[in-house]
Regions:
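P-loop NTP-binding core
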Residues: 1-256
Length: 256
C-alpha cells in the first residue's frame, strides 16, 4: 500500500513548518506508524532534532543530483535522546542543498525527481512527511508534486496570510490532473490576542472546510523541546504542546 505523503509548506518563514514536521512525524510514530521525515530545507532545522551529527554528503541533495541513487543509502534512523528508532527515519539536509537548484536547472522533468525516488521505497512507510523550504522553488515543487496532502501552517500575525492565494494557485497548477487534500493549520495561537485572532479567523472563513479543527497553541514546552533537540512529546508529554500535536496527529490519520 502506498504511503500517505504530507508536504508541510508555506513560502512565508516563521510559521513553524519545521516544528510541525518534527512533532507530527513523532506523533505518527507514537501511533505505531512507519514514518519517514525528509528535510527539504537547507536550514536543516528538522535534521538538527533527529540527527546528532548531520552528514556532510549523505543528505537529500544526493537524491536530486544522482539519478541512480538508492534512496535507502541516505535514510537514517531518527535519534531521540540516546535511542535510535527503527520506525521513525529521516533523510537529513544541510546548507549544501541550496546549491542543488542551480545544478538541476537544465534537468528534464526535474519536478518529478523526488517522486521517482519515493516510488521505489513506497512499501517501507505508512507516512512520509516533507519539511519544505520557505520558497516556492524546485524543491517545494517536487514536494507538492509527489504529495497527496498539502499542509499549510499559518500563524496569527497580521501578515501571516499574505501569499496564501498565490500558494493555493501554484498547488492547483502543479497538481493538475492529480487528486490531493489541502489543509490549513493554525499555529502559534495566543488567546490574549483576541483582535488578531478574530482577523485571522475571518480571513480563513472561506477555507473553513479545509482548516484543521486542531489549533497549535504557542507553548514554552515546544520552544524548550527544540533547544534540547527533542520532540515536544518527549520533552514534556503533559504539556499543551504535546496535547495539541496528539490531536493534530489524530486528525491527520483520519482526514489527510
Amino acid at each position: 500500500m502506498a504511503p500517505k505523503i504530507l508536504a508541510v509548506i508555506n513560502q512565508k518563514g516563521g510559521v513553524g513548518k519545521s516544528t510541525i514536521s518534527v512533532n507530527l512525524a513523532y506523533g505518527l510514530y507514537l501511533k505505531k506508524k512507519r514514518v519517514l521525515l525528509i528535510d527539504l530545507d537547507p536550514q536543516a532545522h528538522s535534521s538538527c532534532i533527529y540527527c546528532p551529527e548531520i552528514p556532510q554528503t549523505e543528505t537529500i541533495s544526493l537524491a536530486f543530483t544522482d539519478k541512480k541513487l538508492n534512496l535507502k543509502s541516505i535514510i537514517m534512523k531518527a535519534v531521540v535522546g540516546n535511542e535510535m528508532i527503527d520506525t521513525l527515519n529521516i533523510i537529513p539536509s544541510n546548507i549544501k542543498l541550496a546549491t542543488v537548484v542551480e545544478q538541476i536547472s537544465g534537468t528534464l522533468y526535474r519536478e518529478k525527481i523526488l517522486k521517482n525516488h519515493l516510488d521505489k521505497i513506497a512499501d517501507a512507510y505508512d507516512y512520509i512527511v516533507l519539511d519544505c523550504p520557505p520558497t516556492l522553488g524546485i524543491l517545494a515543487i517536487n514536494a507538492i508534486y509527489c504529495s497527496n496532502s498539502i499542509i499549510v501552517p499559518t500563524s496569527f500575525g497580521r501578515y501571516s496570510l499574505d501569499g496564501m492565494a498565490d500558494l493555493l494557485g501554484a498547488v492547483k497548477e502543479i497538481k493538475e490532473g492529480q487528486s490531493y487534500n489541502f489543509f490549513v493549520l493554525k499555529n502559534l495561537y495566543e488567546k490574549r490576542n483576541s483582535q488578531t485572532n478574530k482577523y485571522v479567523n475571518e480571513q480563513l472563513e472561506s477555507l473553513k472546510d479545509n482548516t484543521f479543527a486542531t489549533t497549535i497553541r504557542k507553548n514554552e514546552a515546544i520552544n524548550q523541546a527544540q533547544i534540547t533537540n527533542l520532540p515536544v512529546q518527549v520533552f514534556n508529554s503533559a504539556s499543551k504542546g504535546a496535547q495539541d500535536f496528539d490531536l493534530l496527529t489524530e486528525e491527520v490519520i483520519h482526514n489527510a
